[in-house]
Amino acid sequence: MEKKAWLICICCLCCMCGVSAPKKNNFSVKRGVNISHWLSQSNVRGENRAVFFTEADVKFLSEVGFDHLRLPVDEEQMFAPDGSKEKEAFSLLHNALSWCQKYRLKAIVDLHILRSHHFNAKEKPLFTDRKEQIRFYDLWKQLSQELHTYSVDFLAYELMNEPVADDHEQWNNIVAECVRTIRLLEPERSLLVGSNRWQGYETMRYLKIPENDPNLIISFHYYNPFLLTHYRAGWTDVKDYTGKVHYPGKLIADEDLKHLKGELYDKFAYWNKVEFNKEVIEKHFKEVVDFARLHQLPLYCGEFGCIAATPKADKERWYQDMIELFDKYEIARANWDYKGGFGIIEQGIPQTDLIYMLTGRNIK
């Protein structure tokens, strides 16, 4: 009788251990690209949306050496205001995932923009309105319901792109509840979690990682120096500078800087306080590398890149330094982006030098 009771006790303990320690999956990636302005940040619908990204694109990306796609999706494209699914958008998403499987690419579905949260919006109700938080968790329940049949070794989820909360704890609380919500449905799915304030390296130390979860991936974005990577970008606060930029070293030559007057001088002299080079980038990377090592979790740079207007030679030197550091610290990454303003395709033409730097594949 005592022996039987002991066996029952052991079985119960084993079951409890199984619940508290989910199995580590085999999701692993290295070189990817963002499929932007398709199911995210676009007003295009119907046939024009369908032909923007096709099987031929996935085949091309596989052939030139990428091993995964980051697929940004927006709430307004995937879900109607009443919360019901937009069938056409989900059909396109499933098409993309099936093409990835066909051409042996892995995928990350990134919930990019919510009706309650845009990374550049002034008001972000997600952090202050409990109803919006519940709606966010419900979106993930529906996404999980739709996507759970894909292998955990093939597909990962990114909770949300570039959170921007007034207080770091607001985002930490949402991360904890969102992870719990998904884990009830999918205990072994890889989930990507980034820090508050645009997933910057500067705020990584404030991110609270849910404990005892081996299938989390720490994500950050890197666009420094911003004046170089977003050179003349019309939606940014650096759009007014039209002079030359340089990398590495001082971003603006002293000779060019002295020609700026008044507020323009004060604004852009800031960028010359640091001579930007590989050593500076490595110092920034070390912050996220050390954080990931502390938590014994893989690290992923989900966005990095230079806009098309950035001078080619300076852009290529920046990319070369970035890639060398990614490789040195074994950081998986996805370039921003494919066909957009930072794209490896410009006006339909593959940027062969950039592709070679990103993947090591010469397609000339």
Model features per residue range: what roles?
Residues 11-19:
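Hydrophobic h-region of N-terminal signal peptides that target proteins for export
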Residues 49-52, 58-68, 85-113, 120-156, ...:
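An active-site-proximal structural segment forming one wall of the substrate-binding cleft
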Residues 130-275, 282-306, 328-331:
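Active-site region of glycoside hydrolase catalytic domains
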